[in-house]
Amino acid sequence: ACVHYPVYEQNEVDEKILSLEEVIEITHSKNKPVSVDAAGQIYPLENFGKYVKMGADFQCIAAKYMGAPHSTGIALGTKDVIDTIARHSFVGYESRRIRGIGRPHKIDRQEIIGVYAAVKRWMSLNHEERLSYEESKTLNIVNDIKDIEGLEVKIIDNIIGHQPFGLNIDIDSKKIKSNNLDFVDVLKNSEPSIWTRVPDGKDTIEIHVFGMTLDQSKIVGKVIKEKLEGLMI
């Protein structure tokens, strides 16, 4: 058994939730390990191994956010934990006396090479240029729709983690014949289809540009503008 702790450094701190330091202290006092879900904490680079240095026994990072295959990730932790994880291996499964655990969930050699290449590239990447590129995609959308009457547009200025920049939009139903939830469906049924959402606990439509090209961001801005202008009261 262990205590699993998710980390979202880009979010505001919830004072009602125990801090990672407190969780580590309490859990270790009971001689149990702490694992940290740091899936999207790929930037700043100091986050690699940060939570283990804080005292956690293990942290996992999703490699897909760095360009590796979708099903892959990397593990950072104490020697005991990493040695245990290594037993989840399919190498020599048919012939070893101690067979690997989790064979149905294996990843193949090509994916492992993909993770290595993605992490190596990520560590040497010019992140200022990367963030500037993400901001440019955001501005492509914002500039198309910012002057539409009845629409409030706010840029997401976060640069931490795997989804830098993006925008939130809020529809005034008194001026536009739609609302945020309905407009999500309008975009989903548009051509091309654009998938957005109103996240749980929030009221506005959230649009992230992670994974888009510059040209695709221009298309998104154009479609949103056309759909909104067609719904003006």
What residue ranges belong to the model's regions?
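Short amphipathic alpha-helical patches
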Residues: 138, 210-211, 230-231
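A common structural junction motif
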Residues: 91-94, 187-194, 225-232
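Short secondary-structure boundary micro-motifs
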Residues: 57-59, 127, 180-181, 195
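C-terminal alpha-helical cap/extension of soluble enzyme domains
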Residues: 102, 106, 110, 114, ...
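Conserved C-terminal alpha-helix-loop-beta "cap" of PLP-dependent enzymes
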Residues: 144-223
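Conserved PLP-enzyme active-site core in the AAT-like
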Residues: 1-122, 142-146, 154, 177, ...
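Conserved PLP-dependent catalytic core of the aminotransferase class-I/II
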Residues: 123-157
